[in-house]
Every structure is written in structure tokens, then in C-alpha cells.
Amino acid sequence: LQIHLDTGSTGENGFLSVRHKENDQSLDADKLALITWWDGQEKVQSGEVSVKAGWEIVQESDKNGFTINCSHAGLGFSFRFELVINDSILIVNIPATDIKETEKNKLKSIRPLPYFGAANEGEEGYLIISREVGALCYYNNKEPQEYKLPVYNVNGIDMPLFGAVRGTAGFAGIVTSGQFDAQFCINTNRDENRRYSIGPEFDLRSFKDEDLTAEYHFMPTDKANWVDIGKCYRHYNFKHRDIVPLKQRIKESPELAYASLAMEVRLRLGVKPVPYEIVEQTLENEPAVRVFLTFEKVRDIFDEFKSQGIKEAEFCLVGWNKGGHDGRYPQILPVEPVLGGEDE
């Protein structure tokens, strides 16, 4: 990687420019960080980390990258950036032990390198969003908006993966520490430059002394696409998380080998009425279970599968427990009597 860093010692915004050695196009960030905090009146404030915003920023260089110490005497905040270069990977790390608060203000969030790799309206490329099966956001005709999607939450962000392709340049971003307190900030057609960008923001009040770390894997020109960015994350999991591919795991597990070939069939047996008419349910007032399938009917389905020549199938029985689906949790036994009970 070829990196140019200017922390804005003259009063201008700091910026970072990164270029893969096999690519003529660089990806840039025009700010070191954005932060939010609660002031002494418990009101949320926000600002950028820059010299012109009153921060003292001290940059040091070594053979592996840069260390940037940031402090603001008036706000009472200080923390340290580590930018580590490892071949074609830029590791951005904020050590948890170096995040300090010395005044009444309390840090709420830190967003390192906001708008890194941002593209403008109409440029060739797209953002990569790891929502459910995956999404691409092209740089055209989007509403001016900022979205914040927490990682591992109900919105479907199932992986700490993000990325961007801009012309012939691209990166795979992986949040490797602090991911459980992270969210992806997605900007579309924003501000006067009509920018598109994606990157992590870390919430601080509930974090468990974890470093805040994101790795940017820069792609060579012929691999600056969403397919190879996905492969990059796959290889990362193999190397660093000891994840074994299914085709290797089935060699030692007959059950898994069977499941890999079998049709999955979900059978819904019993449920309680939804939406709930009785919110606080007890043994005395809980509603009756609505029956969709009894255990006897389940056996009939098994027999029909066999008669139709379906040899491999895995059946998931939903709502077999006491009270059915959304039943008498945490109590699941005995088996629901109206479905046939223990005898069936």
C-alpha cells in the first residue's frame, strides 16, 4: 500500500489517501474521526476530530504505519489511533485502554475515518452492504440520506463486513474488534459533494474494554468487485476464525453429510393466538393452543414423502412444546397434549 497522511497540523482538516500498489486510483478520507458525546447537561453533542475544532493531534511514524494521539483539553477527551500497514491491509485501531474522559462530558460514539473511499453521484461503482443475502448500492439516483444499521441486530446485518468499489479501486472492510457495539453508517447522495460512503461507528457506553478495530483489505484492479470482496471475507474467516468449510466437515460427520443433501421441511404444529389478546399470561388465563398439525398427521406426511420417492429430508417440528409456538416458555415440557402428547 502507498499511504499519505496529513493530520491537519496547519488547521485544515486531516486526510488520508491510500492506494494499492497495483492500482492507479486512490481512496481517501477527509477527516480522522467524528464523535458524539453527552455534555454536562446530558445533551448529545457532535463534532469532528481536527485541529481547527480545538484538538491537539500528534502524529508519529514507524516502519509499520502511524500512531496518532488525539486530545481535547476543553472537552476532556483523549484517545489514540493506530494505523498499521500489513501488505495490502490497513488496520485502523483505537485501543480501549487509551480512551480517556477527564471532564463531565461522556463519549457516546467514535466514527473513525468517516467517508473513507467516498464516491460522488454518477461515479462507476457501488457500496457493499452485508444485509441478509447482501445488497449493492450504486452511486446514482438515491435520496440524500444517512442510514445507521447496527451489526448483529434485527435489521439483518449478519456480518461485520462492508465494502466499496469505486472505478478500478475497492476494499473489503471487516470490523475485527468491537463489532458487537458497532453500526454501519451509510451515506447516499449527501452534502454538497453528493457523496456515497459506508464505514463503522462504535458505541462506547456499553463496550467491554474491547479495542475498536477495522481492517481495510485493498483489492487489486482485477479483483475490485463484490464477488472478490466476498471471497476476501471468506478467506479471512478461514484464516483467523478457524472456520472449516462444509465440504470438509461432512467427511467426519455422517449426520452433516446427510443434512447437506436433504430437503428441509418446516412443519408448524401448534401456536397461541397472535397478536396477543392477553399480554400477561398465566396458567389460569392462557388461551387455548391453535392446532395446525397433530403428531398423527406428521406421521402421515412422513409416509407420503416416502411414497413419493423422497429419500432424504430433514423435518423441523415447530410448536411441539407445551403451549405450542410462543407457548409456555421457558417451560417446554411436557409435549403439548392437544397435539397427541407423549403417547403420540
State where each predicted segment sits.
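Acidic/aromatic-lined carbohydrate-recognition and catalytic surfaces
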Residues: 319-344
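Carbohydrate-recognition beta-sandwich/jelly-roll modules
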Residues: 1-314
